[in-house]
């Protein structure tokens, strides 16, 4: 039995482990296709880019995760676009460097709920 296990281990070392189990192994086509499709996905957004009027404060963390549309469409003339949005709250530490104070508070961010491939605008 030990000789068989050794032979199997050597074979895997030569040919590679079964799909997806070894770093560098190719991801199967259907998984690549599914992951790349137009859909909501967790995205990091900068607090200052989302709330540019807050430049006098520092934030910890400086970015948050929200769901945003992203991915590929089946036709290059289409773009992955949000068709539904909602406001979500995230607890953030707001630091006022001038007053040397900080407090935890809830800030609102736009999160996408639905996505669709739509024709690209003439300006984009």
UniProtKB/Swiss-Prot annotation:
Keyword Secreted: yes
General function of this protein: Snake venom VEGFs that may contribute to venom dispersion and prey subjugation by inducing vascular permeability and hypotension. This protein induces an increase in capillary permeability after intradermal injection, as well as a drastic hypotensive effect after intravenous injection. The hypotension is mediated by nitric oxide (NO), which is produced by VEGF-activated endothelium NO synthase. Also induces angiogenesis in vitro. Like other crotalid VEGFs, this protein interacts with VEGF receptor-1 (FLT1) with a high affinity, whereas it binds to VEGF receptor-2 (KDR) with a low affinity.
Modified residues (Pyrrolidone carboxylic acid): 25
Localization in the cell: Secreted
Secreted listed as a keyword: yes
Entry comment describing in which tissues the protein is expressed: Expressed by the venom gland.
Signal peptide annotation: 1-24
Gene Ontology cellular-component annotations: extracellular space; membrane
Stored CDD domains: PDGF (cd00135)
One GO process term, biological-process aspect: positive regulation of endothelial cell proliferation
Disulfide bonds: 38-80, 69-115, 73-117
Organism of derivation: Agkistrodon piscivorus piscivorus (Eastern cottonmouth)
Pfam families associated with the record: PDGF
Family statement: Belongs to the PDGF/VEGF growth factor family. Snake venom VEGF subfamily.
Record's protein name: Snake venom vascular endothelial growth factor toxin apiscin
Gene Ontology molecular function: any one: chemoattractant activity
Keywords for this protein: Disulfide bond, Growth factor, Pyrrolidone carboxylic acid, Secreted, Signal, Toxin
Assembly notes: Homodimer; disulfide-linked. Interacts with VEGF receptor-1 (FLT1) with a high affinity, whereas it binds to VEGF receptor-2 (KDR) with a low affinity. Does not bind VEGF receptor-3 (FLT4).
């Amino acid at each position: 039995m030990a000789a068989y296990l050794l032979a199997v281990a050597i074979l895997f070392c030569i040919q590679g482990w079964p799909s997806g189990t070894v770093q560098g192994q190719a991801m199967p086509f259907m998984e690549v296709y599914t992951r790349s499709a137009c859909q909501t996905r967790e995205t990091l957004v900068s607090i200052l880019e989302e709330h540019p009027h807050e430049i006098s404060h520092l934030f910890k963390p400086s970015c948050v995760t929200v769901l945003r549309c992203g991915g590929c469409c089946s036709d290059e003339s289409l773009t992955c676009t949000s068709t539904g949005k909602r406001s979500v709250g995230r607890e953030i530490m707001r630091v006022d460097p001038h007053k040397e104070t900080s407090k935890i508070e809830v800030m609102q961010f736009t999160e996408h709920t639905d996505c669709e491939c739509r024709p690209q605008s003439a300006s984009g």
